From Swiss-Prot:
Cross-referenced HAMAP family: AcpS
Lipid biosynthesis in keyword set: yes
Key words of the record: Cytoplasm, Fatty acid biosynthesis, Fatty acid metabolism, Lipid biosynthesis, Lipid metabolism, Magnesium, Metal-binding, Transferase
GO molecular function, one term: holo-[acyl-carrier-protein] synthase activity
Bridged cysteine pairs (disulfide): none
Organism from which the protein derives: Staphylococcus carnosus (strain TM300)
Localisation per UniProt entry: Cytoplasm
Residues binding Mg(2+), per UniProt: 8, 59
Presence of the UniProt keyword Ligase in the record: no
Protein name: Holo-[acyl-carrier-protein] synthase
Cofactor: Mg(2+)
Root EC class: transferase
Gene Ontology biological process terms in this record: fatty acid biosynthetic process
Gene name in the database record: acpS
Purpose: Transfers the 4'-phosphopantetheine moiety from coenzyme A to a Ser of acyl-carrier-protein.
């Protein structure tokens, strides 16, 4: 049974600006595994795209959960990884999580569907 659906869209330029102003931004948003992948990218544009995509994914997840980010779930509670084919996934107890992340030159977007197990 579908529990919730969330979607988020963010400007990559906004994330780039925040990255310049707040050097610890990636550490605040990304899990340890995500941060390792982020740091493997050598180009700042790719880093911004990745961070924007993960930010959108986590926002979409929190919207699907119905709580938003804050008291009940934080950025660090949501760990979005990629499987061997590159598909994003999130494991969250009690739910099957369907994740989609996309990028254009200027935007990153994500949709998350939660199924109650």
């Amino acid at each position: 049974m579908i529990y919730g659906i969330g979607i988020d869209l963010i400007e990559i330029g906004r994330i780039k600006t925040l990255m310049e102003r707040q050097k610890k931004l990636p550490e605040r948003i990304l899990s340890k595994d995500e941060l390792t992948k982020f740091e493997s990218f050598s180009h700042e544009q790719r880093r911004a795209e990745f961070l924007a995509g993960r930010f959108a994914c986590k926002e979409a997840f929190s919207k699907a959960l119905g709580t938003g980010l804050g008291k009940h779930v934080s950025f660090q509670d949501i760990n979005c990884q990629n499987d061997e084919l590159g598909r994003p996934y999130i494991r969250y107890e009690g739910f099957k999580v369907h994740v989609s992340i996309t990028h254009t030159e200027n935007y990153a977007a994500s949709q998350v569907i939660l199924e109650k197990m």
